[in-house]
Amino acid sequence: GVPCLCDSDGPNVRGNTLSGTYWLAGCPSGWHNCKSSGPNIGWCCKK
């Protein structure tokens, strides 16, 4: 999957670890949305 920035990673992508994974159709079972203000399309999820 494509890495994405969770709220816990920091305010921006520069210099921060991207601990989330981008899912177009929503988070799979056992994962949760980790970005409160997510992208317009898809979700940023982590296990």
Swiss-Prot record:
SUPFAM superfamilies on file: Defensin-like
Sorted UniProt keywords: Disulfide bond, Ion channel impairing toxin, Nematocyst, Neurotoxin, Secreted, Toxin, Voltage-gated sodium channel impairing toxin
Gene Ontology MF term list: sodium channel regulator activity; toxin activity
Disulfide bonding pattern of the chain: C4-C44, C6-C34, C27-C45
Keyword Disulfide bond: yes
Superkingdom of origin: Eukaryota
GO terms under cellular component: extracellular region; nematocyst
Biological process (GO), any one: regulation of signal transduction
Classification via InterPro entries: Anenome_toxin, Myo_ane_neurotoxin_sf
Predominant subcellular localization, coarse grouping: secreted
Subcellular location: Secreted; Nematocyst
Function: Weakly inhibits voltage-gated sodium channels (Nav).
Family, as annotated: Belongs to the sea anemone sodium channel inhibitory toxin family. Type I subfamily.
Record-given protein name: Delta-actitoxin-Axm1c
